[in-house]
Amino acid sequence: MLKESSRTDRKEDEMPGDDKDIEACTSRCLDCYRSCLQTTSQHCLEAGGAHVEPGHFRLMLACAEICRTAAHTMLVGIEQHGRICAACAEICRACAESCAGLDGMSECEEACKRCAQACERMA
């Protein structure tokens, strides 16, 4: 009779970070995804000016998407999530910096910083 292998028995399923760290990082990524996407659509578009400057606006959209992707890779449990998290941290840092000089962006800026810190621990 074949032994049923559990997820923890298989080498290819090992991921950096323990379950608590992964859960915390996933939560931070989803928070940042939500914050960036809502802020672009509900604040930046309304505010106009520097808030919709192409470089800033594209960075916020990219940040939202990489955060969603990082959360997805951790939720599905692939071992390569650390590389996605490293890219996520880099983009989140850039997004936080871009948001820092604009009014009404402090919540998004802080969400990006928290996500970057969590992702750096996973990378």
Where in the sequence are the language-model features?
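Amphipathic alpha-helical hairpins
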Residues: L2-A123
